[in-house]
Amino acid sequence: MAPDPWFSTYDSTCQIAQEIAEKIQQRNQYERNGENTTKLTVTIRALLQKLKEKIALLKDLLLRAVATHQITQLEGDRRQNLLDDLVTRERLLLASFKNEGAEPDLIRSSLMTGGAKRGAPNPWLLEEPEETRGLGFDEIRQQQQKIIQEQDAGLDALSSIISRQKQMGQEIGNELDEQNEIIDDLANLVENTDEKLRTETRRVNLVDRKSTSCGMIMVILLLLVAIVVVAVWPTK
């Protein structure tokens, strides 16, 4: 699975924030020792600007991912929480850079080798979600990717179910078409049979009428013969 560009950008942004915290601590140490801090100050300013641009990029990527439904609303909310934490960290770093507030203890507590580890609280995450509390950046990313994979698997299963239902619907439709064709054939057969029956009935009636007429003619002929015979029969 290809790495998520949002989390790749998020990791690099966190690294920049970590580097800024280290540079600010180093600058403060130089100031206490009376050393020149001009070069460090320029570097910190450049890093702060880069951090600002990275956060803006993260916001843009998140908005596009949510708008195009590349991620779920729940995943969008989780990423927004991480982004809010970065914005808070940026403000604290900017305040520390300007020497506003008692930042040295805060910066020292943020300097953890290799980033945040499991079980080691991150002082920059003032309201860290319960799901990600005590997790490092890599672990958070893995957790988010696992959630996305589970959601993708659920969507694949749903798509498979819908495809099967669609196929069943098509099969039922084909079967109904076949049944309709059979019914149409039966209707045509019944109609043809009925027409034949009517034709044969007419023929039978015609034959019957002819037979009746022939019988009457025979009776008349017999009567005529009888009359003739009686007429010519000699009488005493």
UniProtKB/Swiss-Prot annotation:
Its main location: membrane. InterPro entries: Syntaxin, Syntaxin-8_SNARE, T_SNARE_dom. One of its GO terms (biological process) is vesicle fusion. Residues 233-236 are vesicular. It is a single-pass type IV membrane protein. Ubiquitinated by HECTD3. Gene3D superfamilies: 1.20.5.110. The keyword Transmembrane helix applies. SUPFAM superfamilies: SNARE fusion complex. One of its GO terms (cellular component) is intracellular membrane-bounded organelle. The chain crosses the membrane at residues 216-232. Residues 1-215 are cytoplasmic. The keyword Thylakoid does not apply. Pfam families: SNARE. The modification Phosphoserine is found at residue 160. PANTHER family: SYNTAXIN (PTHR19957), SYNTAXIN-8 (PTHR19957:SF124). Forms a SNARE complex with STX7, VTI1B and VAMP8 which functions in the homotypic fusion of late endosomes. Part of the SNARE core complex containing STX7, VAMP8 and VTI1B. Interacts with VAMP8. Interacts with HECTD3. Interacts with TPC1. This is Syntaxin-8.
